Curated annotation (Swiss-Prot):
Lineage: Bacteria, Bacillati, Actinomycetota, Actinomycetes, Kitasatosporales
Tagged with keyword rRNA-binding: yes
Keywords: Ribonucleoprotein, Ribosomal protein, RNA-binding, rRNA-binding
One Gene Ontology term of the molecular function aspect: large ribosomal subunit rRNA binding
NCBIfam families recorded: PRK00099.1-1 (NF000955)
Subunit composition and interactions: Part of the ribosomal stalk of the 50S ribosomal subunit. The N-terminus interacts with L11 and the large rRNA to form the base of the stalk. The C-terminus forms an elongated spine to which L12 dimers bind in a sequential fashion forming a multimeric L10(L12)X complex.
Native source organism of the sequence: Streptomyces coelicolor (strain ATCC BAA-471 / A3(2) / M145)
The protein's name in its UniProt record: Large ribosomal subunit protein uL10
HAMAP family, per database record: Ribosomal_uL10
Role summary: Forms part of the ribosomal stalk, playing a central role in the interaction of the ribosome with GTP-bound translation factors.
Single Gene Ontology BP annotation: translation
Length: 176
């Protein structure tokens, strides 16, 4: 039977899984408290990094409708719950792991879909949402200006063709 404390912890973790855009599971063995504080700061304001109990986390994920591989729960585990841009937090974890090899990214969840550690690293390689949206807007603007130039070119080409035909007819008419 679960104690009230464990039930409350599971309820809190379940709520975090449901309210987060992403959750990244990591192994933190060998990191100091100071390093964990630095990691929390590097994740940004839209992420919470918490050391969790594996069994309670697995139960909470299942209650949130998320199926995670049992291998993700081997060893000491901490979870980064991301409520903002998942790319920003994934970059923070990746960059911190480069400098601190004791941090191991195990895998995670993005919008309810389980992701491997490699997929999390690929997510970190993406540009931020704002940059991608600005590139998309630039592409649309470029296409619109090309389309406008095309529509402007068609009538002017038609006018030049008609003028050339008129000039040719005038030459032929004048030569007769």
């Amino acid at each position: 039977m679960a104690t009230p404390e464990k039930a409350a912890a599971v309820a809190e973790l379940t709520d975090k899984f449901r309210s987060s855009n992403a959750a990244v599971l990591t192994e933190y063995r060998g990191l100091t408290v100071a390093q964990l504080k630095t990691l929390r700061r590097s994740l940004g304001e839209n992420a919470q990094y918490a050391v969790v109990k594996n069994t309670l986390t697995k139960i909470a994920a299942n209650e949130a409708g998320i199926t995670l591989d049992d291998q993700l729960f081997a060893g000491p585990t901490a979870v980064a719950f991301v409520t903002g841009d998942p790319v920003e937090s994934a970059k923070g974890l990746r960059d911190f792991a480069k400098d601190n090899p004791n941090l191991v990214i195990k895998g995670g969840v993005l919008d309810g879909k389980a992701m491997s550690a490699d997929e999390i690293k690929k997510l970190a390689d993406l540009e931020s949402r704002e940059v991608l949206l600005s590139k998309l807007a630039g592409a649309f603007k470029g296409k619109q200006s090309q389309t406008a130039q095309l529509f402007q070119a068609l009538p002017s080409k038609l006018v030049r063709t008609v003028d050339a035909l008129r000039a040719k007819q005038d030459e032929q008419g004048g030569a007769e």
